[in-house]
């Protein structure tokens, strides 16, 4: 700082995915792997409030919509698209694993442009004005990538502590709550005049009483599951799209014929044996078995 260094008896580390200070303190001994990081990239597009409410079917200005899109939008690779409304803007983007982008030599802005031109997305942002383009790295390793959460004079929160639930797209809430709990612990340390790891261990105890550590432990196998089962990003979304399209359409065919075609559509993409194994693996990853 131009005004000099700032000293404090306790520091709450909120440095995000680039965990330089966390490493310097010896709370973690490695960089996060690209396979455990997602890159979220988006455009913020300006539209007037009335247009947003009309296009998204919002009855009141206090209401909003968040949409998640799975499958072709990420080229069938691990990732997901999103659209969410703000009062006078719409945010449109995708999240894809960093190693996937590198392996397939994909340029994020080209993938995003393809997404924006999708017939389901383009009408929502038609005639809008681009205000921002941005990207953000998100740690998705979860439980296995968490550093030690406290030491003498310091606590680690949010993305810096890999507090992200990839399945439920939770991270902001965990950052806010962990920051609050760290602040409560810091206040207690000030009252005691003791900023040692013994006192700051109260931060982890507070986390254990809530949902963050419980959920991260339960879903500790989920990131690995996504790495080894790309079918859930490409094969199965495509199948469900075709199956539901057929199910809710009137073709003038006997329903037995329709169900036979749906069944054949699945087995053409994935054998029943493998599909059953995929379901079991997903259950284990989600339930933490």
Question: Model segments located where?
Answer:
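Short acidic (Asp/Glu) and glycine-rich catalytic loops that position anionic groups and cofactors
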Residues: 90-95, 158-162, 181-184
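Short amphipathic alpha-helical face segments that pack within enzyme cores
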Residues: 16, 40, 174-185
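Active-site-proximal flexible loops/turns
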Residues: 20-23, 54, 166, 177, ...
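FAD/FMN-dependent oxidoreductases across multiple families
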Residues: 73-79, 100-180, 191-205, 209
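C-terminal helical "tail/cap" subdomain of flavin- and related membrane-associated enzymes
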Residues: 187-289
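Predominantly flavin-linked oxidoreductase catalytic cores and closely associated redox partners
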Residues: 1-126
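Active-site catalytic microenvironments for nucleophilic, acid-base chemistry
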Residues: 14, 24, 185-192
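Short coil/turn segments at secondary-structure boundaries
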Residues: 55-57, 126-129, 216-223
């Amino acid at each position: 700082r131009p005004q000099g260094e700032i000293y404090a008896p306790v520091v709450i580390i909120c440095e995000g995915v680039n965990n330089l200070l966390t490493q310097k303190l010896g709370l973690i001994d490695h960089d996060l792997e690209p396979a455990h990081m997602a890159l979220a990239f988006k455009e913020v597009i300006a539209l007037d409030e009335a247009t947003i409410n009309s296009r998204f079917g919002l009855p009141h200005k206090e209401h909003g919509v968040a949409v998640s899109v799975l499958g072709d939008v990420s080229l069938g690779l691990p990732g997901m698209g999103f659209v969410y409304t703000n009062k006078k803007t719409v945010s449109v983007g995708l999240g894809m694993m960093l190693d996937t982008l590198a392996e397939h030599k994909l340029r994020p802005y080209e993938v995003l442009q393809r997404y924006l031109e999708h017939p389901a997305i383009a009408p929502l942002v038609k005639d809008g004005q681009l205000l921002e383009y941005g990207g953000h790295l998100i740690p998705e390793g979860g439980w296995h990538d968490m550093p030690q959460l406290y030491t003498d004079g310091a606590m680690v929160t949010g993305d810096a502590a890999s507090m992200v639930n990839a399945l439920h797209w939770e991270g902001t809430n965990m950052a806010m709550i962990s920051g609050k709990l760290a602040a409560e612990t810091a206040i207690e340390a000030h009252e005691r005049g003791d900023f040692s790891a013994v006192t700051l261990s109260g931060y982890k105890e507070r986390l254990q009483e809530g949902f963050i550590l419980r959920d991260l432990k339960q879903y500790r196998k989920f990131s690995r599951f996504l790495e080894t089962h790309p079918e859930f990003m490409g094969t199965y979304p495509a199948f469900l799209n075709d199956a539901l399209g057929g199910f809710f359409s009137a073709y003038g065919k006997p329903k037995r014929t329709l169900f036979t075609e749906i069944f054949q559509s699945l087995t053409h993409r994935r054998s029943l044996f493998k599909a059953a194994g995929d379901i079991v693996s997903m259950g284990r990853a989600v339930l933490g078995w």
